């Protein structure tokens, strides 16, 4: 729950940063590296000891995580915070579908319900974004892409996690992802150096160290259904921040879309805790 709450405040920090959206993602990773190394040391988890396959998996995961963050931060800049958080967490449904494909079986009732709720809610939210403007719709699509990329990032981390602890995994994935984000920011012509550092420090500490660290830790200690229920705290906090800080008022149809997507995510998490999650 604490990890999800920390992650929920990430979009607020992205909006407040005075550098570009991809640049803020670069600083999120770069500033977090010393803290991640310290956490690994205090946990007694050495940063080395990976096999060649392990190094390759973690490096690939880091690249996917960088692309996920770039896409998500671009989406946060364009769409409403509630939409950005829900669509950015759409990996639960994508992971469930991946598991069904890997198992070569048809969805069960709960899985059909997860798909129906998620797709129905997404259609409502995307329709509302079309009404608001093209920029908002583009932001939604960036966040959905981020959900796809985050799914495969988690799949690679789960494969690499077998012989090592959570902190070394997160450290090396972060180390691999930072240069990718810097390259994208420079190609986009974004300002990289900020004038005000505190939003980036909050982003690095809250999202990358506390948020990501606790979520990766929770993968080992809690059921996917529990994680899915805790996940709902993210969009709830993001909606409140968007409403009170950025004046992103919602109408009843927005709440309906968000509830449907949230229900789909929880049902998908519950499904991935059984057969659907086994191939990962």
Regions from the PLM with identified roles:
Residues 36, 40, 59, 65, ...:
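Hydrophobic transmembrane alpha-helices of multi-pass small-molecule transport proteins
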Residues 17, 24, 28, 59, ...:
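Hydrophobic/aromatic residues within transmembrane alpha-helices
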Residues 28, 52, 85-88, 104-124, ...:
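Loop-to-transmembrane alpha-helix entry segments
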Residues 23-34, 73-106, 146, 224-243:
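Specific alpha-helical transmembrane segments that line the substrate/conduction pathway
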